[in-house]
Amino acid sequence: MLLHIPHVLTREQVRACRARLDAADWADGRITAGSQSAQVKRNLQLPQSSPVAQELSAQVEQTLRQHPLFFSAALPKRFFPPLFNRYEGGMNFGNHVDNALRYLPGTTDAVRTDVSATLFLSDPDEYDGGELVVEDTYGVHSVKLPAGDIVVYPSTSLHRVEPVSRGARVASFMWIQSLVREDARRTLLFDMDMNIQRLRERHGDTEELVGLTSAYHNLLRLWAEV
Protein backbone atom coordinates (compact mmCIF):
# COMPACT_ATOMS: atom_id res chain seq x y z
CA MET A 1 0.00 0.00 0.00
CA LEU A 2 1.26 3.43 -1.00
CA LEU A 3 -0.60 6.20 0.82
CA HIS A 4 -0.43 10.00 0.57
CA ILE A 5 -1.41 11.76 3.81
CA PRO A 6 -1.83 15.53 3.41
CA HIS A 7 -1.19 18.28 5.96
CA VAL A 8 0.72 16.24 8.53
CA LEU A 9 2.58 19.45 9.37
CA THR A 10 1.02 22.91 9.23
CA ARG A 11 2.58 25.63 7.09
CA GLU A 12 3.87 27.26 10.28
CA GLN A 13 5.48 24.01 11.42
CA VAL A 14 7.11 23.55 8.01
CA ARG A 15 8.51 27.09 8.05
CA ALA A 16 9.91 26.64 11.57
CA CYS A 17 11.47 23.30 10.64
CA ARG A 18 13.00 24.66 7.45
CA ALA A 19 14.50 27.64 9.26
CA ARG A 20 16.35 25.25 11.57
CA LEU A 21 17.41 22.94 8.75
CA ASP A 22 18.55 25.69 6.39
CA ALA A 23 20.94 26.94 9.07
CA ALA A 24 22.25 23.47 9.96
CA ASP A 25 25.51 21.78 8.96
CA TRP A 26 24.87 18.96 6.48
CA ALA A 27 27.06 15.91 5.80
CA ASP A 28 27.49 13.34 3.04
CA GLY A 29 24.32 11.24 2.96
CA ARG A 30 26.23 8.00 2.54
CA ILE A 31 26.88 7.93 6.31
CA THR A 32 23.68 5.91 6.82
CA ALA A 33 23.67 3.89 3.58
CA GLY A 34 24.30 0.18 3.31
CA SER A 35 27.08 -1.08 1.05
CA GLN A 36 24.85 -1.39 -2.01
CA SER A 37 22.89 1.83 -1.43
CA ALA A 38 26.09 3.82 -0.90
CA GLN A 39 27.03 3.18 -4.52
CA VAL A 40 23.95 5.02 -5.82
CA LYS A 41 23.33 7.57 -3.05
CA ARG A 42 24.28 11.20 -3.73
CA ASN A 43 22.70 13.60 -1.26
CA LEU A 44 23.25 15.51 1.96
CA GLN A 45 22.04 14.39 5.36
CA LEU A 46 21.80 15.94 8.80
CA PRO A 47 24.03 13.88 11.16
CA GLN A 48 22.06 11.98 13.79
CA SER A 49 24.35 13.40 16.47
CA SER A 50 23.26 16.94 15.61
CA PRO A 51 21.14 18.57 18.36
CA VAL A 52 18.95 20.10 15.65
CA ALA A 53 18.39 16.68 14.06
CA GLN A 54 17.53 15.10 17.41
CA GLU A 55 15.07 17.84 18.36
CA LEU A 56 13.29 17.90 15.00
CA SER A 57 13.31 14.11 14.79
CA ALA A 58 11.49 13.86 18.12
CA GLN A 59 8.93 16.42 16.97
CA VAL A 60 8.24 14.56 13.72
CA GLU A 61 7.87 11.22 15.48
CA GLN A 62 5.52 12.64 18.11
CA THR A 63 3.37 14.26 15.42
CA LEU A 64 3.10 11.03 13.45
CA ARG A 65 2.30 8.90 16.49
CA GLN A 66 -0.64 11.22 17.20
CA HIS A 67 -1.92 11.27 13.59
CA PRO A 68 -4.90 8.87 13.30
CA LEU A 69 -4.57 8.17 9.56
CA PHE A 70 -0.84 7.48 9.79
CA PHE A 71 -1.39 5.26 12.81
CA SER A 72 -4.10 3.27 11.02
CA ALA A 73 -1.92 2.75 7.94
CA ALA A 74 1.42 1.98 9.60
CA LEU A 75 0.30 0.46 12.92
CA PRO A 76 3.64 1.58 14.38
CA LYS A 77 5.37 -0.46 17.04
CA ARG A 78 8.78 1.23 16.86
CA PHE A 79 10.31 4.09 14.92
CA PHE A 80 13.85 4.41 13.73
CA PRO A 81 14.34 8.09 14.64
CA PRO A 82 13.32 10.22 11.62
CA LEU A 83 16.24 11.57 9.60
CA PHE A 84 16.60 14.60 7.30
CA ASN A 85 18.07 14.84 3.82
CA ARG A 86 18.68 17.43 1.14
CA TYR A 87 19.12 17.09 -2.63
CA GLU A 88 20.51 19.90 -4.80
CA GLY A 89 22.84 20.46 -7.75
CA GLY A 90 22.07 17.22 -9.59
CA MET A 91 22.04 15.00 -6.49
CA ASN A 92 19.98 11.82 -6.67
CA PHE A 93 19.53 8.38 -5.12
CA GLY A 94 19.44 5.45 -7.55
CA ASN A 95 17.24 2.38 -7.34
CA HIS A 96 17.55 0.53 -4.04
CA VAL A 97 15.64 -1.34 -1.36
CA ASP A 98 15.96 -0.19 2.25
CA ASN A 99 17.96 -2.37 4.63
CA ALA A 100 15.77 -4.89 6.43
CA LEU A 101 17.19 -3.90 9.83
CA ARG A 102 18.31 -0.53 11.16
CA TYR A 103 20.27 -0.38 14.40
CA LEU A 104 19.48 2.40 16.83
CA PRO A 105 22.49 4.72 17.20
CA GLY A 106 25.08 3.45 19.67
CA THR A 107 23.22 0.20 20.39
CA THR A 108 22.77 -3.34 19.14
CA ASP A 109 19.00 -2.81 19.25
CA ALA A 110 17.50 -3.38 15.79
CA VAL A 111 14.35 -1.97 14.23
CA ARG A 112 12.83 -4.09 11.45
CA THR A 113 11.92 -1.84 8.53
CA ASP A 114 8.36 -2.71 7.53
CA VAL A 115 7.13 0.75 6.51
CA SER A 116 9.07 3.58 4.88
CA ALA A 117 7.89 7.19 4.81
CA THR A 118 9.00 10.52 3.34
CA LEU A 119 7.73 13.78 4.82
CA PHE A 120 8.23 16.57 2.28
CA LEU A 121 9.60 19.87 3.62
CA SER A 122 9.98 21.63 0.24
CA ASP A 123 7.09 22.62 -2.02
CA PRO A 124 7.15 21.25 -5.59
CA ASP A 125 7.75 24.70 -7.09
CA GLU A 126 10.96 25.11 -5.05
CA TYR A 127 12.87 22.55 -7.11
CA ASP A 128 12.92 20.69 -10.42
CA GLY A 129 13.23 16.91 -10.47
CA GLY A 130 13.55 15.14 -7.14
CA GLU A 131 10.54 12.87 -7.59
CA LEU A 132 10.38 9.84 -5.31
CA VAL A 133 9.74 6.91 -7.64
CA VAL A 134 8.36 3.77 -5.97
CA GLU A 135 8.04 0.47 -7.84
CA ASP A 136 5.68 -2.17 -6.49
CA THR A 137 3.42 -4.96 -7.75
CA TYR A 138 0.88 -2.38 -8.96
CA GLY A 139 3.32 -0.41 -11.11
CA VAL A 140 5.57 2.63 -10.88
CA HIS A 141 4.51 5.63 -8.78
CA SER A 142 6.12 9.08 -9.05
CA VAL A 143 5.62 11.15 -5.90
CA LYS A 144 6.25 14.87 -5.41
CA LEU A 145 4.10 16.36 -2.66
CA PRO A 146 3.47 19.74 -1.03
CA ALA A 147 5.54 20.60 2.02
CA GLY A 148 3.95 19.10 5.12
CA ASP A 149 2.55 16.05 3.29
CA ILE A 150 3.85 12.51 3.77
CA VAL A 151 3.92 9.38 1.63
CA VAL A 152 3.92 5.95 3.28
CA TYR A 153 4.90 2.76 1.44
CA PRO A 154 6.23 -0.76 2.14
CA SER A 155 9.94 -0.93 2.85
CA THR A 156 10.15 -3.91 0.50
CA SER A 157 9.59 -1.55 -2.47
CA LEU A 158 12.31 -0.72 -4.97
CA HIS A 159 12.55 3.08 -5.05
CA ARG A 160 14.72 6.03 -6.08
CA VAL A 161 14.94 9.82 -5.99
CA GLU A 162 15.36 11.49 -9.37
CA PRO A 163 18.12 14.10 -9.86
CA VAL A 164 17.35 17.62 -8.62
CA SER A 165 18.31 20.08 -11.36
CA ARG A 166 17.14 23.31 -9.70
CA GLY A 167 16.65 24.41 -6.11
CA ALA A 168 16.73 22.10 -3.10
CA ARG A 169 14.54 19.18 -2.07
CA VAL A 170 14.45 18.90 1.73
CA ALA A 171 12.62 16.08 3.49
CA SER A 172 12.42 13.91 6.57
CA PHE A 173 12.57 10.18 5.96
CA MET A 174 12.01 7.32 8.34
CA TRP A 175 11.38 3.63 8.87
CA ILE A 176 8.79 2.01 11.10
CA GLN A 177 8.56 -1.45 12.57
CA SER A 178 4.87 -2.24 12.38
CA LEU A 179 2.76 -4.32 14.72
CA VAL A 180 1.79 -6.19 11.53
CA ARG A 181 4.82 -6.97 9.37
CA GLU A 182 3.06 -8.04 6.15
CA ASP A 183 1.92 -5.26 3.83
CA ALA A 184 -1.11 -7.20 2.54
CA ARG A 185 -2.41 -7.65 6.08
CA ARG A 186 -1.79 -4.01 6.99
CA THR A 187 -3.65 -2.96 3.84
CA LEU A 188 -6.63 -5.15 4.71
CA LEU A 189 -6.76 -3.76 8.25
CA PHE A 190 -6.44 -0.19 6.97
CA ASP A 191 -9.28 -0.67 4.46
CA MET A 192 -11.47 -2.19 7.17
CA ASP A 193 -10.72 0.65 9.56
CA MET A 194 -11.49 3.34 6.97
CA ASN A 195 -14.80 1.73 6.01
CA ILE A 196 -15.79 1.20 9.64
CA GLN A 197 -15.23 4.89 10.27
CA ARG A 198 -17.30 5.88 7.21
CA LEU A 199 -20.15 3.60 8.26
CA ARG A 200 -20.07 4.99 11.79
CA GLU A 201 -20.33 8.56 10.49
CA ARG A 202 -23.27 7.61 8.27
CA HIS A 203 -25.23 5.20 10.46
CA GLY A 204 -23.87 5.43 14.00
CA ASP A 205 -22.88 2.42 16.10
CA THR A 206 -25.26 -0.16 14.68
CA GLU A 207 -25.19 -3.80 15.70
CA GLU A 208 -23.60 -4.70 12.37
CA LEU A 209 -20.90 -2.07 12.82
CA VAL A 210 -20.07 -3.42 16.25
CA GLY A 211 -19.63 -6.82 14.60
CA LEU A 212 -17.29 -5.39 11.96
CA THR A 213 -15.28 -3.59 14.62
CA SER A 214 -15.00 -6.86 16.52
CA ALA A 215 -13.72 -8.58 13.37
CA TYR A 216 -11.10 -5.83 12.88
CA HIS A 217 -9.75 -6.19 16.39
CA ASN A 218 -9.75 -9.97 16.23
CA LEU A 219 -7.71 -9.86 13.02
CA LEU A 220 -5.31 -7.39 14.62
CA ARG A 221 -5.07 -9.68 17.65
CA LEU A 222 -4.30 -12.61 15.34
CA TRP A 223 -1.61 -10.82 13.32
CA ALA A 224 -0.01 -8.33 15.69
CA GLU A 225 3.50 -8.95 17.04
CA VAL A 226 4.00 -7.25 20.39
UniProtKB/Swiss-Prot annotation:
InterPro entries: Oxoglu/Fe-dep_dioxygenase_dom, PKHD_C, PKHD_hydroxylase, Pro_4_hyd_alph, Pro_4_hyd_alph_FE2OG_OXY. 2-oxoglutarate binds at residue 169. Keywords: Dioxygenase, Iron, Metal-binding, Oxidoreductase, Vitamin C. It comes from the Bacteria. The keyword Heme does not apply. Its cofactor is Fe(2+); L-ascorbate. GO terms for biological process: DNA damage response; intracellular iron ion homeostasis. Transmembrane segments: none annotated. Pfam families: 2OG-FeII_Oxy_3 (PF13640), PKHD_C (PF18331). Fe cation binds at residues 96, 98, 159. This is PKHD-type hydroxylase LHK_00496. It comes from Laribacter hongkongensis (strain HLHK9). The lineage of its organism: Bacteria, Pseudomonadati, Pseudomonadota, Betaproteobacteria, Neisseriales.
